[in-house]
Structures are given as structure tokens and as C-alpha cells.
Amino acid sequence: MTKYVGAIDQGTTSTRFIVFDRKGQIFSVAQREHEQIYPRPGWVEHNAVEIWLNTRTVILEALEKKGLSTSDLAAVGVTNQRETALLWDRKTGEPLYNALVWQDTRTDQLVARYAKEGGQDRLRAKTGLPLATYFSGLKLHWILDNVPGARAKAEAGDALFGNIDTWLLWNLTGGPDGGIHITDVTNASRTQLMDLEKLAWDEDILKLFNIPAACLPRIVSSSERYGTGKGPLEGVTLSGILGDQQAALFGQACLHPGEAKNTYGTGNFMLMNTGEKPFPSTCGLITTVGYKLGDAKAVYALEGSIAITGALVQWLRDNLGIIKNSADIEPLARTVSDNGDVYFVPAFSGLYAPRWDDSARGVVCGLTRFANKGHIARAALEATAYQTREVLEAMVKDSKVAIRELRTDGGMVVNELLMQFQADMVNVPVVRPKVIETTALGAAYAAGLAVGYWASTDDITQNWGVDRRWHPHMAAEQREHLYGSWNKAVERSLGWAR
């Protein structure tokens, strides 16, 4: 019997291949970063070919590290940065343009146009999403309108559209030589083109955005046998697809209504399982598909998305040179006892949930001659916690469910200063699991369940375990003073891009 399940974790800054055992423990991992392309202010692109080549490389490296072959893998799943979208030539496999990253704001004029005609929430009832630059349907709209020849190819069926999951699955199954053109329900729900209840492309929205159905992938469940790999995964069953945040929800064993997790990565993403019916938000959150296992009913989620959290640490490293490595942020922040009344609002791509303001831009408030780089570092970390509190409060108000603990995952959860401050700010315990790579683990679970490697979701629940728990210690008066000052800083960030 095969011993392992693999997961491709294609994120905003890097691609990893992780091999898991039956207990959900990491057996092998390889990782490669890819270039971030910034052609203009607000524009963010990725080279999709570079991402595909990195994917091939990390698969081979992770297997070679432990002397594994593809025959040791029962199945492989894919999880991906959602909303990042591209259009490519069906015959050659060449992208017609760089992938437009989820943070990219070039569709702001399209958002304004459609919002003016019918309001920002005109598509929320069908899609669960407000009009925003975040989602990939309008990114496709921009490519079709601005890349020479793109629309003609798309209408003829000679160009294929997809988020990164679709791009990788197509290449992994042969590319121009019979590649499978599919996307799962979680990724499709991030395009703003899918009807949440019907789980199908919506003809009225396609007509509104002038998008040809011929270029769209077939929508499938998150866990089923899609096909067999070629190239680096020759002969391996490909059987799991989940957008990264839904994968983390699944990997965190949030399998019952009311259970929630918060991922700390390039951005922050809090998701709460709401069961088998879409739960409309009135507090600025989005309604999305959580997962769908084969023929079972889809499970839905409420989500609060924060654009810039870990990316702010990268910005301090790469753009300002305040730190040499991302891990240096915590010791630098610990050189000061508090934030020195400095507040950082990292609205580099506007503000996402619950405010949804594309006009906001980043600001630092409260600077005096007393402030130093330690205060800047601390303010950057605290910004993540303030934004998370804002989303958590909206989620509690929407769902009418009190969150008793916050399950966390992602790269930033190794930062103990941040985790303690997060517990203080939301006033509930913050929990870090033993395996923090829950995004990749969720994709592995989806793939493994489809082929019987794991018998049921009970195995997922049994595998989950606590590594550390942080309890709130901050006095209520101090907590509310800090949060009130943060909100004052947010008001200063609004309206800059108008």
C-alpha cells in the first residue's frame, strides 16, 4: 500500500510540495520563491510559466530528498492563491499575459463603473461577493479588453481561463497534449462568475461582464478523481483541489458550523464554517464555498479577507531595509515595550473586509522624534491583530455565534509576540496546531479522502492537535484605547486613491 499523500501549495510568494503521512505529519518538503512583478503602482503580476516550472522542480526535489518515487504517492492535491488569474493559449500553453495577482487593483475603474450602475452589492445575492478589485472575474474582463487578440481567442475556445489551480492541473495532466481544464467549487466561488447555490457559471453575470463561456473551466468538487498526472507526477492520481484559505479551514478540522480559523500569510483570512446553506453577510464579510467532498452537499463559509499582513513584513524587509530577514521582525519589535503611540495601516491594495474601500492607501500615524524602527516593527505586527479583531467582530455579529477560541495557521504564527497580542486584542484564546502547514494539509486530505487513503473526515479530526495556546492578559481599558487609536488611524487612510 502506498505510504503518503502529496500536496502542491502554490502561494503568493512561493510554491511548495509537501509529502504527508497518515497522521498528517510532514515527511518531506521543498520550496521555491517566484518573482513579484510591479509594473505600476497598484499592479501586481506573476509569471505563470515560472510558477509552473517551480512546481515541477519542488515536486522532484521533495521526492528526491527522501528517496521517494511517484509510486509512493496514493494521490496529490492542489491548493493555490485564490483570485490570481490568467488566460493562456490552448494549443501552445503560453500565457497571453502575466497572471494578475489577487492584490492587483487595476480593475478599480471597472469596479466603479459596475457599482455606479447597480451598487457595490449588486452581485452579492448570487455570488456572495461585493464588487471589488480582489476577485478574478473582472481581472479576466481586463485581460480580454486590453491584451491584443485575447478576446477573439477566448470566444473561439482557443484561449483558456483559470485561477492558478486550473493552470497547474492543466499542465500536470498534459497541457496542450490533453490537459484537463477544471476548477473546483472553492476557486470558482472567487471569480464572482459562479452562482453560489447552483455551483455553476451564471449566464447573466457572464453577459454583464462580456465574458465568453468558451474559455471557462468545468466546475468540479474539491475531492474526486480528476485524472492521472504526467511529467513529474507520472501515473499519480490527482484528486483534490481547494483554494488556499478553504484548504486551511479543512486542514484545521473546522468541519462543523461555528468552527473558525485564521490564516496568517501574505494576507490574513478568517473563515467560519456555516454549514450546507450560503449564509448572507450584512457586516462586510463575504459568503464563499468552504469545500465540497465528491457528491456530498457543498459546505459554505463566511470569510473576512485582509489584504496585507505578512506582506507588510516583506515590505519592511525589501523596500525599506529595516530588517534583513522576515524572522527579524519579532526581535526588533521586542526592543521596545510598546508601540510608542505609532499605528500602521497597511492599505497598500485598499482595505478589504469589512470596509471594502479601494480608495484607501497605507499610512503610518503618530510619529514623533521618539519613534524608532522598533516602534515601526511593533506597529506593523499590531496592525495584523487590529485588522483581525475587526473581522472577528463582524463574523460574530453576522453569525450570532460567539467564537470561543481562534485557531491559527500560516507562516506568521511562529511569531509569539504577535500571537500574544492577538489574544489580548480579540480577548479569546489563540491556538496554534501541531502542524501549522494546514493549507497544504487540507489539500492532501481532500486528495486522500477521494482515493480512500483516509477513510473519513473523522481521521482529520483525530489528527488535529494543539501545539500552544495563548490566553488574553491585557486590561480591557488598555485594549480599547489601542483599538480606538487604530480606528482613528484607519480614518486617515481613506480616500487617497480617489
Swiss-Prot record:
GO biological processes: glycerol catabolic process; glycerol metabolic process; glycerol-3-phosphate metabolic process
Keyword annotations of the record: ATP-binding, Glycerol metabolism, Kinase, Nucleotide-binding, Transferase
Residues that hold ADP according to the record: T12, R16, T266, G310, G411, N415
Molecular functions per Gene Ontology: ATP binding; glycerol kinase activity
Residues that hold sn-glycerol 3-phosphate according to the record: T12, R82, E83, Y134, D244
Positions bound to glycerol: R82, E83, Y134, D244, Q245
Pathway, per record: Polyol metabolism; glycerol degradation via glycerol kinase pathway; sn-glycerol 3-phosphate from glycerol: step 1/1
GO cellular component, one term: cytosol
Organism the protein comes from: Azorhizobium caulinodans (strain ATCC 43989 / DSM 5975 / JCM 20966 / LMG 6465 / NBRC 14845 / NCIMB 13405 / ORS 571)
Gene: glpK
Family: Belongs to the FGGY kinase family.
E.C. code: 2.7.1.30
Regulation: Inhibited by fructose 1,6-bisphosphate (FBP).
Chain sites annotated for binding ATP: T12, T13, S14, T266, G310, Q314, G411
Catalytic activity: glycerol + ATP = sn-glycerol 3-phosphate + ADP + H(+)
Function description: Key enzyme in the regulation of glycerol uptake and metabolism. Catalyzes the phosphorylation of glycerol to yield sn-glycerol 3-phosphate.
Disulfide-bond pairs as recorded: none
InterPro entries: ATPase_NBD, Carb_kinase_FGGY, Carb_kinase_FGGY_CS, FGGY_C, FGGY_N, Glycerol_kin
Keyword Zinc applies: no
Enzyme class: transferase
The name this protein goes by in its record: Glycerol kinase
